[in-house]
UniProtKB/Swiss-Prot annotation:
It comes from the Eukaryota. Residues 165-175 have a biased composition (Basic and acidic residues). Residues 1-110 are annotated as: Interactions with ADPRT/PARP1 and NCL. GO terms for biological process: single strand break repair. The histidine triad, also called HIT motif, forms part of the binding loop for the alpha-phosphate of purine mononucleotide. One of its GO terms (cellular component) is nucleolus. This is Aprataxin. Its EC number is 3.6.1.71, 3.6.1.72. DNA-binding protein involved in single-strand DNA break repair, double-strand DNA break repair and base excision repair. Resolves abortive DNA ligation intermediates formed either at base excision sites, or when DNA ligases attempt to repair non-ligatable breaks induced by reactive oxygen species. Catalyzes the release of adenylate groups covalently linked to 5'-phosphate termini, resulting in the production of 5'-phosphate termini that can be efficiently rejoined. It comes from Bos taurus (Bovine). The record marks S188, H265, H276, K291 as: Interaction with DNA substrate.
Length: 356
């Protein structure tokens, strides 16, 4: 009995949990974050980031492997953010599984993954990877909605942004919001109060931070982390998601004069594949910056039908290189292609098209 006890104890002593920093667009190999060790990440050959706005020591990371999070300290001058909430120079916050760390200026998205390693004498190491973004270990963080997307709270006005006003001095609000979305879309899609429509295959919720008067997300119940995980086996599901999106438009916005688009972000920032159903008025206080606009009005936004055709022909979804650069393009009206210098001027310009 004592020998068995000692053997089990020996095995437990070599069981350890490790953390990895993973670039969402897979531009480079993942970076190991040893438990309680400080790791500096920024512009370097390792990250393949050449952007001069990103410092060589942009962030300081320290993994709390036993607690399941990473402490992130912004060291560089330009803003680092988590789920589009800016950390602030020399400020430190926690990065949870399911959240997306944007290294600088809401570019270069990273997520964290935890693995359990067990090393037994005379045996190879056994690893159990925990995917980020959900309580389901098969899922992985995957929309640069500039804020994380979930359903609206009960009683919310779908035409109003539910983001609270910015209070630079109130750091506690920022930190609270970082933790609140740690489970991504999974919680919202399973909350009956947030559901607009559901059937055996999909559920529809209103985007927590709508970028237009009408902005819904269609999500499959099946655990599909992102478009990269989609295969021909999912073709019927993709078609059903598209059909449900069109049904929601007819049921809830049938009298709207605005046209709609259905599509996916090329590099989403939240776990669980989701189809955007969005009206083209872009009349929302949540539409705040160039990244928001370009994520829906450049090739960064993949049309639903185009994705279906791609999967039908190639068996998978291919996203070309350089997608993050599209988010930095000049602001251009999606109706007449006129260039506008700022978001306020773009919004004022868009009003001219509403009456047409």
């Amino acid at each position: 009995m004592s020998n068995v006890s000692l053997s089990a104890s020996a095995v437990s002593r070599v069981m350890m949990r490790v953390c990895w920093l993973v670039r969402q667009d897979n531009r480079h190999q993942r970076i190991k974050l040893p438990h309680l060790e400080t790791v500096m990440v920024g512009r370097s050959p390792e990250t393949k980031i050449a952007d001069k706005k990103c410092s060589r020591q942009q962030v300081q990371l320290k993994a709390e492997c036993n607690k399941g999070y990473v402490k992130v300290k912004q060291v560089g001058v330009n803003p680092t953010s988590i789920d589009s909430v800016i950390i602030g120079k020399d400020q430190e916050v926690k990065l949870q599984p399911g959240q997306v760390l944007y290294l600088v200026n809401e570019l270069y998205p990273y997520i964290i993954e935890f693995e359990e390693e067990t090393k037994s004498p005379g045996l190879e190491s056994h690893r159990k990877r925990k995917r980020s973004g959900s309580s389901d270990p098969t899922e992985r963080g995957a929309d640069p909605e500039a804020e994380p997307s979930t359903g609206l709270e009960p009683g919310s006005n779908p035409h109003q942004c539910s983001v609270p006003p910015k209070k630079e001095k109130d750091a506690s609000i920022k930190k609270e919001s970082l933790g609140h979305w740690s489970q991504g879309l999974k919680i919202s899609m399973e909350d009956p109060k947030m559901q607009v429509y559901k059937d055996e295959q999909v559920v529809v919720i209103k985007d927590k931070y709508p970028k237009a008067r009408f902005h819904w997300l269609v999500l499959p119940w099946a655990s599909i982390s992102s478009l990269k995980a989609v295969t021909r086996e999912h073709l019927e599901l993709l078609r059903h998601m598209h059909a449900v999106g069109e049904k929601v438009i007819a049921d809830f916005a049938g009298s709207s004069k605005f046209r709609f688009r259905l599509g996916y972000h090329a590099i989403p920032s939240m776990s669980h594949v989701h189809l955007h159903v969005i009206s083209q008025d872009f009349d929302s206080p949540c539409l705040k910056n160039k990244k928001h606009w370009n994520s829906f009005n450049t090739e960064y936004f993949l049309e639903s039908q185009a994705v279906i055709e791609m999967v039908q022909e190639a068996g998978r979804v291919t996203v070309r290189d350089g997608m993050p650069e599209l988010l930095k393009l000049p602001l251009r009206c999606h109706e007449c292609q006129q260039l506008l210098p700022s978001i306020p001027q773009l919004k004022e310009h868009l009003r001219k098209h509403w009456s047409k």
